[in-house]
Curated annotation (Swiss-Prot):
A GO cellular-component term linked to this record: plasma membrane
Taxonomic source organism: Campylobacter jejuni subsp. jejuni serotype O:2 (strain ATCC 700819 / NCTC 11168)
Pathway field: Lipid metabolism; phospholipid metabolism
InterPro entries: G3P_acylTferase_PlsY (IPR003811)
Spans through the membrane: 3-23, 87-107, 118-138, 144-164, 167-187
Superkingdom classification of source: Bacteria
Gene: plsY
Keyword Transmembrane helix attached: yes
Assigned keywords, A-Z: Cell inner membrane, Cell membrane, Lipid biosynthesis, Lipid metabolism, Membrane, Phospholipid biosynthesis, Phospholipid metabolism, Transferase, Transmembrane, Transmembrane helix
GO biological process: phospholipid biosynthetic process
Record's protein name: Glycerol-3-phosphate acyltransferase
Length: 202
């Protein structure tokens, strides 16, 4: 029963669309109706930038921090309280599911990058560092957020086998589930990348 309460709480917390809330409150803009219609930091930056570039950067950074924290803080807390790895991985997946398929937005949501990073920094920090380096390099070269994110995701999955071939839960299934969710949410971006129609944001 305790685990079910934790799972429900994490999903509901992960579902909070911080980007949407911040853009509506501070920029009076509904990012669900503009840009890519995503609730993540990239769309916050893209949409708000048209009206107020300085505010756009602040709101995008705040969105990243809050989306990151809504997974990282609960996982850190549960890890500190010595909950087992199986529960921690379940919580990680649920936090990302909540962000990508928010109950508050009729199961629409963001792309899962910041929330995924927040979850994984607790469980696989070295892999997240590797992914971040790849994200920065690809972002600097191509200036395309989705391409950088997908490259970072690939680096994360590959490095999870290099640095942690045998995870404590004895399976990489949660890593693949998380990767699948994020790739699924990026399918429109992948299509635009293939046809060279993806916008440069970074």
């Amino acid at each position: 029963m305790e685990n079910l309460i934790i799972y429900a709480f994490i999903y509901l917390l992960g579902s909070i669309p911080f980007g949407l809330i911040l853009a509506k409150f501070f920029a009076k803009t509904d990012i669900k109706k503009e840009g890519s219609k995503s609730i993540g930091a990239t769309n916050v930056l893209r949409v708000v930038k048209e009206k107020n570039p300085k505010l756009a950067k602040k709101l995008a950074i705040a969105t990243i921090i809050l989306d990151f924290a809504k997974a990282a803080i609960p996982l850190l807390t549960l890890k500190f309280l010595h909950y087992d790895q199986a529960l921690l991985w379940s919580v990680a997946v649920l936090a990302i599911l909540g962000h990508c398929f928010s109950i508050y937005l009729l199961f629409e949501g963001g792309k899962g990058i910041a929330t995924g990073a927040g979850a994984m920094i607790v469980l696989l920090p070295l892999e997240v560092l590797t992914a971040f380096i790849v994200w920065v390099v690809i972002g600097k070269i191509f200036k395309i957020s989705s391409l950088a994110s997908l490259a970072a995701l690939l680096a994360f999955v590959v490095s999870s086998f290099i640095f942690n071939y045998d995870l404590e839960i004895h399976t990489h299934a949660p890593v693949f589930i998380i990767a699948f969710i994020i790739v699924y949410k990026h399918l429109p971006n992948i299509k635009r990348l293939i046809f060279k129609e993806e916008c440069k944001v970074i």
